[in-house]
C-alpha cells in the first residue's frame, strides 16, 4: 500500500494526524490504537487484456482498512465504483450505505487531480469517520468550477454524481412510469461475439465493427424476434476518452448510433436500445438519444468507458410517434432556467 498508517500509544492522548508514521512489530510490549489509515492504493491488476478490462483491486484496500477499525480512513481511488460492475457491485453498495463517509471529493477529469494522468471515470478521495453517522459533504470539481452538496450517498437507487442534478432527476421520476433500462438489450444482443464477421453469402446482413456484410439467419442465437424489426443500435463504448470532457468542460457521451432496418443484426460491438415496427419510430428514438437531455441523464451514471442497459436507468421512455427536442423535454419536465443551464454547460451538441 502506498500510504501511511498513523498510530498512537494507548493513554498518550489524541493522535496527531500528519505526525510521522510509527510501525510496530509483533514483539512490541505496547498496545497501540490505530488512528488514521490514509493511502493511494494500487488501482488494478492486468488480466491479459486491455486496461479497460483490468480487474480493480483498490476496493480490497478500502475494505481491509475499515477492518482495522481505525478512527479515520482516507484514500484516493478511481471513481468507477460509483456505477459498480467489474467486481465492484458489492463494494459500491457498501460505500453508498456507509453513513460514516463524512466527505467525498470528486474529480470528473483525473487530470485536475493527477496532471497528465487519464483515469477513465475520474478520481475521488474520501474521509471515513468511525464516529460519523449522517450526511456526506460531496464536493465536485468540474471544468474549473466547484460544486458542493450535503446529502446521503444512498438517497437514490443509483448514485448521482452531481448534487445539482438531483432536482432534475426528481422531476423526471415523478412523471415517468418506465425507464429505458427495461428495454435496452444486454451485451451480445443477437448472441454474436465481436470477432464474428460476415459470411460469403447469406439471407440477412451483419453490422460489425468494420461495416456490413452478408450473414446467415440460422447463425443468430438470441433475440430472433428482433431480426425483422427496425432497430436502434449504439456502440458499447463511450465517445469521451477516459470519460473526460472537452476543453469547454462538455461531454458527448455516445459515439456510434444508427438505425438498422429489418433483416440486419449486429455483433456485441453494439447494444440494441429498442426495436420498432416502423422506420419513423426508430428515427424518432435516434433523435431523442441525441438530445442533451438524454445524454445528461446517462452521464449521471456513466463513470466507465462502457455503455450498458444500466446506464439508461434514469432515461424515461417516450411516445415515439413524434420526434422530441430538448426544448420540448425541458418544458415537459418543468425544468428551471438554472437546471437547463446546468445541462447545457455539461453536454455538447450532437448532430
Please name every model-derived segment:
Residues 110-337:
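C-terminal substrate-recognition regions of SAM-dependent nucleic acid methyltransferases
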